[in-house]
Amino acid sequence: MRDCDLLVALDVDGTVLHHDGHLAPAVLDRVRALDALPHVHVVIATGRSVLSTVPVVEQLGLAREGRPAVCSNGAVTVRTDLTNGTGYRLVDVVTFDPAPAVALVRQELPDVLVAVEEIGVGFKVSTPFPPGELWGEEIVVPDEELLAHPATRVTFRDPSSTSQEFTELVERIGLHGVSYAVGYSAWLDLAPEGVSKASALEQVRRHLGVEPHRTVAVGDQRNDIEMLTWAARGYAMGQAPAEVVAAADRVTGTVDEDGLAEALDEVLAELA
């Protein structure tokens, strides 16, 4: 059984990387040890855009031709392409109409910052975001252009609010026709309805021919809940909110304690 294909899905921020972007040597060592096994598929599954995912894949030494990665909380799936200059090729893109949800949120927070992802470019934004929060080009555009086309992801940011206030806002207004996740700061991501890291990983699993009971996932935030439930073994990082811990099978150390290395040690010993 240990020789059967195994899929290991890893969140990035707060899991692979520390919140300051640091990659711990212990984590890098365990990821590469797993990736060296021919029957193990290490797959990045992140809320990051494609542009900010590719450098992480490269930093981990995972940039092998055809390797899948799940980006934008499941709305965008890519495979490594070492021939076209971008480092990736698009495999699946799911979009939705962002206008109704943006109107609802703005009724409650008229000054909220809004960003709409532009694959391979960056983001169209209503107002510039705090420095360092968005990867790629930020293009300030009027609302008619911001909301004119179907989107893979819409991000709301209110530097004066808290994560709890955003959670209460979502529960109060009701958001229909979309999937959503509140970040650890006052950050709200919208994705197409029914789309999550889990939905994209299920397609990856089937393509790779991995059996459902041979799946592992590690994550730390609310956008990881579906992925942790989907996996046969889900690990929550030690700093994860209570609802994320509840969705997991096991809890590992915090990101500051290199908890991912601890979890992958278990995977190497018990499953791989």
Task: List each language-model region with its residue ranges.
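Asp-based phosphoryl-transfer active-site loop
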Residues: 4-21, 44, 228
